[in-house]
């Protein structure tokens, strides 16, 4: 039984480790940028670190430069703790990859797991590129469309962003053609429109981008039979992964507890049933049946021997119980005369 209990506890532990993944003392917080991760030169961005864990302190630092770590006291509202870090006015030295951590009051030197990385990019440093659409900015639903970003500047990389999306696409610039460098972004069959912009950057300064191109509105006409959901629209079939992990972990714990309880109850019932059966065995199988020892008549004594619920009987017959049949030998007595002295 002890082996079964240990096995179930181990299974529950590893499943819970899968439902709630973490590296630090507490779960990782989330890091967001307001109004967005692309920040124009000299403007300010707010980096918000938040969590449903009641952290008292939040720390923010930029990768590669730990001396830039910032510390704020957390605010608590509606079960959420958060801290807003103001970064700006934006310069090249402030661009980079940021992470944040949480900490509670009684353990200020024990940090949570780090948040997911957030790239903060400074824009507006170089000449803006041009953005165009092929076959055009207005396409039929399901029709393929390609956006081309080009410039006379020798950018190594071009970046395409869609309004409302946090992540951008990037492609290396192609060879110079007719005095311009260009990168093509195939979007595939069009299902949803949107406003797009592109930027250029150099390989040795990936967080420093050019001015954005003029915005390009891509319109999709018609109703496709099977349209994909827009990346900016929440899907009703997709829930919060963290809440889903919590729900799965709780269900696993409850199931393991019920199985353990059923196993212990089954063992207890079996032991109790065996004890009752032993107490109710016939008394005749465990006692010696005999008459009063003072009587002279021969008698038969029957013993019952109990050995792990298997009964064997021995029948013992006293010598007087042997059959009273006359012996076959004939004995003849002869009277002899007394000898005189």
UniProtKB/Swiss-Prot annotation:
Highest taxon of source: Eukaryota
Pfam families xrefs: ig (PF00047)
Signal peptide bounds: 1-21
Annotated keywords: Cell membrane, Disulfide bond, Glycoprotein, Immunoglobulin domain, Membrane, Receptor, Repeat, Signal, Transmembrane, Transmembrane helix
Extracellular side: 22-245
Disulfide bonding pattern of the chain: 49-100, 149-198
Localization terms from the record: Cell membrane
Transmembrane segments: 246-265
Glycosylation sites: 84, 178, 211
Main location group: membrane
CDD domains on file: IgC2_D2_LILR_KIR_like
Bilayer topology term: Single-pass type I membrane protein
Keyword Transmembrane helix: yes
Self-association and partners: Interacts with ARRB2.
Function: Receptor on natural killer (NK) cells for HLA-C alleles (HLA-Cw1, HLA-Cw3 and HLA-Cw7). Inhibits the activity of NK cells thus preventing cell lysis.
Name the record gives this protein: Killer cell immunoglobulin-like receptor 2DL3
Organism: Homo sapiens (Human)
């Amino acid at each position: 039984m002890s082996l079964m209990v240990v096995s179930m506890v181990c299974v529950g532990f590893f499943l819970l480790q899968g439902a709630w993944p973490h590296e630090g003392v507490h779960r990782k917080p989330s890091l967001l940028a307001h109004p967005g991760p692309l920040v124009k030169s000299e403007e300010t961005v707010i980096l918000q670190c938040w969590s449903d864990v009641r952290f008292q302190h939040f720390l923010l630092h930029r990768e590669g430069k730990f001396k830039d770590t910032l510390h704020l006291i957390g605010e608590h509202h509606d079960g959420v703790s958060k801290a807003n870090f103001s970064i700006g006015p934006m310069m090249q030295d402030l661009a980079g990859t940021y992470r944040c951590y949480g900490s509670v009051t009684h353990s200020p030197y024990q940090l949570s797991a780090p948040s997911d990385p957030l790239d903060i990019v400074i824009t507006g440093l170089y000449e803006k590129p041009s953005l165009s659409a092929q076959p055009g900015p207005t396409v039929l639903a399901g029709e393929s469309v390609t956006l081309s970003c080009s410039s006379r500047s020798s950018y190594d990389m071009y970046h395409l962003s869609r309004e409302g999306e946090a992540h951008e696409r990037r492609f290396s610039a192609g060879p110079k053609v007719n005095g311009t460098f260009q990168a093509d972004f195939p979007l595939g069959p069009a299902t949803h429109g949107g406003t797009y912009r592109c930027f250029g950057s150099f390989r040795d300064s990936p967080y420093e981008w050019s001015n954005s191109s003029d915005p390009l509105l891509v319109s999709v006409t018609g109703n496709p039979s099977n349209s994909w959901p827009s990346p900016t629209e929440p899907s009703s079939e997709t829930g919060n992964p963290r809440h889903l992990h919590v729900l799965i972990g709780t269900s696993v714990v409850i199931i393991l507890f019920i199985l353990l309880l059923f196993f212990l109850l089954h063992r207890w019932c079996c032991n109790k049933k065996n004890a009752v059966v032993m107490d109710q065995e016939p008394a005749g199988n465990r006692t010696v049946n005999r008459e009063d020892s003072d009587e002279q008549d021969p008698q038969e004594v029957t013993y019952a021997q109990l050995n792990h619920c298997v009964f064997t009987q021995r029948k013992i017959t006293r010598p007087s119980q042997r059959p009273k049949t006359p012996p076959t030998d004939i004995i003849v007595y002869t009277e002899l005369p007394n000898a005189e002295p």
